[in-house]
Amino acid sequence: MHWTIIGGGLQGTTIAIQLRELGLSRDKLTIIDPYATLCEQFNDFSHRISMPYLRSPIVHHIHPNPFHLKQFAKVQQYAHGTYGQYQRPQTDMFMHHVHEQVHHYDLNENHIQGYVEALAKKDGQWQIQLNDNQVIHTDCVILANGCTHKPYIPNIYQDADDVCHIFDKSFNTTMYGHSSHVIGSGISAAHLTLKLINQSHDKVIHLWMNKDIDIQHFDADPGWLGPKNMNHFLNIESSLERQSIIQHERHKGSMPRELYLRLKKHIQSGRLIIHKENILSVDQHQIHTEQAAIPYDFILLATGFEPTLLKQPMIQSLIKNEDAPLTRCGLPSISSELEWLPQLFMSGGLADLELGPFARNIMGGREAAQRIKQAYKRLSAQPIQKHA
């Protein structure tokens, strides 16, 4: 039985390793991702904002053994491999571990660089058409292509001069030196602000936020990582209620205390000014608020990503042509094994209603791998069907 994972980021790679650990042979696995190497987007984005440590603890990584990264850090003798009481792993160490595991499981041999143009069921198999017109036939598909497809650029910045989203394809490193203004309220904006401060000895950086700083250790309360909260959540029948809980429990636009304290230090030294005024417009190199017009050199946006989950052509095609079921809240109606259609599985945001507030981060990938593990065992026990 052949498995294809669409998306070679952290979650797709986590699931791929789980399948290989379960005994899936190398020639029965394909990973489709547009980047040249697996997990490249995460690595690129982390470097763009100079994030020294991950937000999640050291037990959250791509290998099935929760202590694998900790053991790796010890063997590799990383100095300052973790930070703080929650043992947040050093980003470079984390990525070193990722690359080691990708190499160990020969996942680069499974990687096809490209985009999926179409996905359809034909003669009992899934048929995947890529942007180069290559067609892949596979028995099982896992959608793990993430939620970071299109950076969110608020309307007032759409036509403004010298404005770029930090995660946009048009971004280049020369923009750091020209930028004194950052827009955003979360962890990416905080890291980016600190990067700009550290790149200059005297430049004053302006951080524009649309709310007070929200200090949270993690993306959501750790109770959502286990039965403490998830048992009740999974007993709720209403998809609308589940979605409401997820939106309430996710700490969107927040940052851990240590980041806040680093920002505070620069406020006190005069290197950082935080603005909480509502920005009315941006034009002629000026930021207009109700009180003032402040000139800017270059603005870097750290405003997150657009909610494009269900807008992807591949997803729309499955809904229209394969009758893929949706819940009342509009998200895929999936099983406890994250199965949307026969032998088509979800991870990340598409599995929100099963995985809860942590669905979209590293731990969500680990939980998705565990759910799909059960499906793999079930399908492997079935008689092999011959296709026409």
Residue ranges: model-predicted function:
Residues 35-62, 215-230:
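Conserved N-terminal glycine-rich FAD pyrophosphate-binding loop of Rossmann-like flavoproteins
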